[in-house]
């Protein structure tokens, strides 16, 4: 078989799969900023990274699985946390629950409605 034809077929096959890949729905630009701000506030309130880690969902881009609501009032995140390594325990044993409301533009913490023991 012609090497050039073989290479062209390989390229066509590899490119053919690209159309099947779907991009994740785009997030508002403010959402990842808001998520980072909320996570950093929880870290600060709970003793810093030496003694606290937020749930893994808060490290995902935009923290969509920790996002309770998105409205004209802002982004409300709710997540658990605990000492470093809590999520690797079996079963995971978080010790704290935090809710943080961040402005619609992702620039300011508007409120921390709850930060304390898991309810």
Which residues make up each language-model segment?
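Residues embedded in well-ordered secondary-structure elements
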Residues: 12, 27, 66-68
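Sec/Tat signal peptide C-region and signal peptidase I cleavage site
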Residues: 18-24
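Short, non-transmembrane alpha-helical segments in secretory-pathway proteins
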Residues: 24-61
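A short, surface-exposed interaction/processing loop segment used at functional sites
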Residues: 93-119
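Exposed beta-strand-loop-beta-strand "reactive/processing" segments of non-cytosolic proteins
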Residues: 54-101
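Central antiparallel beta-sheet cores of small beta-barrel/beta-sandwich binding domains
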Residues: 24-30, 41-45, 75, 79, ...
